[in-house]
């Protein structure tokens, strides 16, 4: 998936799921399942319930996404 093909949205972590998956509520109210991007995993960035994150969604499946940034 090329970076320019993804849709980036802001969201909040609702709950933690197994295998570093998270349930994220987007600003528009939709709830998606997201996993951590490789660079965040490599740098051991921890994500907890309630964190504000940026999620990259693919136009092909808007129910799944990738967490690319955790706001401070």
From Swiss-Prot:
It comes from the Bacteria. The keyword Metal-binding does not apply. One of its GO terms (molecular function) is rRNA binding. One of its GO terms (cellular component) is cytosol. Residues 1-72 form the S1-like domain. It is found in: Cytoplasm. NCBIfam families: infA (TIGR00008). Belongs to the IF-1 family. One of the essential components for the initiation of protein synthesis. Stabilizes the binding of IF-2 and IF-3 on the 30S subunit to which N-formylmethionyl-tRNA(fMet) subsequently binds. Helps modulate mRNA selection, yielding the 30S pre-initiation complex (PIC). Upon addition of the 50S ribosomal subunit IF-1, IF-2 and IF-3 are released leaving the mature 70S translation initiation complex. This is Translation initiation factor IF-1.
